[in-house]
Amino acid sequence: MASSPLLFVLLLLLPLEVPAATRWSLLEALPEGAAPCQVGELCLQASPQKPDVPLVNVSLYYEALCPGCREFLIRELFPTWLMVLEILNVTLVPYGNAQERNVSGKWEFTCQHGERECLLNKVEACLLDQLEQKIAFLTIVCLEEMDDMEQNLKPCLQIYAPKVSADSIMECATGNRGMQLLHINAQLTDALRPPHKYVPWVVVNGEHMKDAEHLLHLVCRLYQGQKPDVCQLTAELSKEVHFK
């Protein structure tokens, strides 16, 4: 997958030569107060401007090697997350169109893009399980941007989670823990109502989002509290397009 200018900017802001204690990054600007998540998921939740105003919930059901999933994650969800984190609650569920079966007490998986995708789904599930929420999200975005995700697991971890080894993540992915995490994601995916028909399958506030190309505009429209400044800009641009 071709690298995006946005990710290159992020990487430039996180040079490996800079000590972790003094490293300037977008992570330092992210609000604290992320809520605990269920295992196998990622819930990135910053403190809302008003505690009585619910955040907008966005859930992404996807698979690691799906081109459309990668495009949505990198070009739509990630930029939206960066711009309106304070009003957004995100859940990631890597599984997609895979199938599972129980063989002698162990779960075996068949993935749409082959065994490599099953492994990468487990890798991302393990990242979500073992890393702090924001760090896991950024690491997954880093991986999904790369053509060879296995080879880039270590570099992406060195950028965002230098104390975590790629070997520990791969041990999780290839062991019982990875199998358990993917089974949990299978259950979450199978529980969708209506059932998912394709991936990426995006659910916003409990409703399937058919038009996944205007996520920022939708999040801004649905949030009932004081909106970030970028929402006003989005509304003005929408009006300009409408009148043209």
From Swiss-Prot:
InterPro entries tied to this protein: Interferon-induced_GILT (IPR004911)
Residues with attached carbohydrate: N57, N89, N102
UniProt keyword list: Disulfide bond, Glycoprotein, Immunity, Lysosome, Oxidoreductase, Redox-active center, Secreted, Signal
Something else known: Both precursor form and mature form have thiol reductase activity.
Record note on quaternary structure: Dimer; disulfide-linked.
Post-translational modification: N-glycosylated. Sugar chains contain mannose-6-phosphate. Synthesized as a 35 kDa precursor which is then processed into the mature 30 kDa form via cleavage of N-terminal and C-terminal propeptides. Processing of the precursor is mediated by multiple lysosomal proteases.
Record-level GO cellular component terms: extracellular region; lysosome
Pfam families hit by this protein: GILT
Signal peptide: 1-20
Role of this protein: Lysosomal thiol reductase that can reduce protein disulfide bonds. May facilitate the complete unfolding of proteins destined for lysosomal degradation. Plays an important role in antigen processing. Facilitates the generation of MHC class II-restricted epitodes from disulfide bond-containing antigen by the endocytic reduction of disulfide bonds. Also facilitates MHC class I-restricted recognition of exogenous antigens containing disulfide bonds by CD8+ T-cells or crosspresentation.
Gene label: IFI30
Protein name according to UniProt: Gamma-interferon-inducible lysosomal thiol reductase
Cell location: Secreted; Lysosome
Organism expressing this protein natively: Bos taurus (Bovine)
Propeptide, residue positions: 21-51, 227-244
Cystine bridges: C66-C69
GO biological process: antigen processing and presentation of exogenous peptide antigen via MHC class I
A molecular function (GO) term: oxidoreductase activity, acting on a sulfur group of donors
EC number: 1.8.-.-
Family: Belongs to the GILT family.
